[in-house]
């Protein structure tokens, strides 16, 4: 699913109007019917409703929705804010229609200060003040109204966007002036700002409504951002040759674990095997030998000459993919071995955890990373790589995109909607996964899965997309059977086979 910017949303609307063809007012009516149906599914006609409509097309949507609901018997009080005596054409048309219908309980056009109505816990507020076209923080009377609504006990349903929230960049927005919706009914596609954790408090329950915008237009408009869906993933899956053997299924190297952190090596290696690798070699300190041999008997163990930390780089000519970083620590000897290992790699590399922290501590080494390397930071790890904290998720994503292009790397910003930043500037969001995965070791498992897929022969981009999706899907299956509260990272490995099978069904 493509994610469009506010300008592209307008472009798609215009494409639909021109090529369907359909008048813009009729397209608004079609959207309003879909919105009204969704609202009537949530609340009965006995529910009192208050609509706050702005002067633009979002307000036009709200007026049309209110009229349609009133025609069904809902008792709706409508306020249209026309402070500057300038309505969009379609908003003006819907103002006239709502007046002529005489079905709403009360219609008030606000042209100056007004006393807001009482909003109690039985009331539903239809928020249609501002939508995807908003490009600056709310201020003045609109900001005061938003605060009044937020402080009330009413349930709020926002049309397309919670008023005050911008479609992409909210770095310098005033968060106190954004509607906190109970439900957001967004039109056609999710918006970029919906995928950032700091904005979840405004969105509430999200429903995406299909208003039948042009499929041809959607295909033609090039989007920088996309959400990975199951239909995108299924075609990527390789089949196993019935004549395959371990030598043809890919050989992976996992450089992981200092003494006391052998679990990171174990989880990455197990996940690597579960992702389909034919052979997995674990390079780890000597004191981890027994733990790794017992925990992953399938693995080949290559012991470092150091007892408790990794101090040497090994040859990678016999490997098809390499993971480095989980649990290796950050002592200087390990740091030197790590960058040497990465520089001399002859296969695709996945760098995670301490490998990323080492790079952050030796920023000049960043330019020595091989093209096509996969970096998998969580937010704090990325901020350290960036050299300074990011103000919010949008800024972090923007900087990660720039870094991925500059380094010609693949960067996965981990989180609820993990974002894969590609070397060409495009970004793919993963929508599988849940809060039960917020536990130590989940990142080691992701590293192992991606490395196993690389060893199998997937390209870096496909391995990242498939790896993120499978990782989250395994978590979703585990949560359904175990509950989020009690999940551990090893459960992701346990349920990875079921995730594969789900995709093959």
Residue spans for each PLM region:
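Small-residue (G/A/S/T)-rich helix-start motifs and N-terminal tracts that mark the onset
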Residues: 1-82, 88, 183, 194-349, ...
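Nucleotide and nucleotide-moiety/phosphate-recognizing core
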Residues: 36-129, 137-159, 337, 345
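Short acidic-hydrophobic sequence patches enriched in Asp/Glu that either
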Residues: 87-90, 141, 176-179, 488-491
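Short acidic loop-to-helix transition motifs that present clustered carboxylates
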Residues: 112-114, 161-167, 192, 307-309, ...
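A short, aliphatic-rich alpha-helical micro-motif
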Residues: 119-123, 178, 316-317, 342
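Internal gly/pro-rich beta-alpha loop/helix module
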Residues: 122-124, 129-223
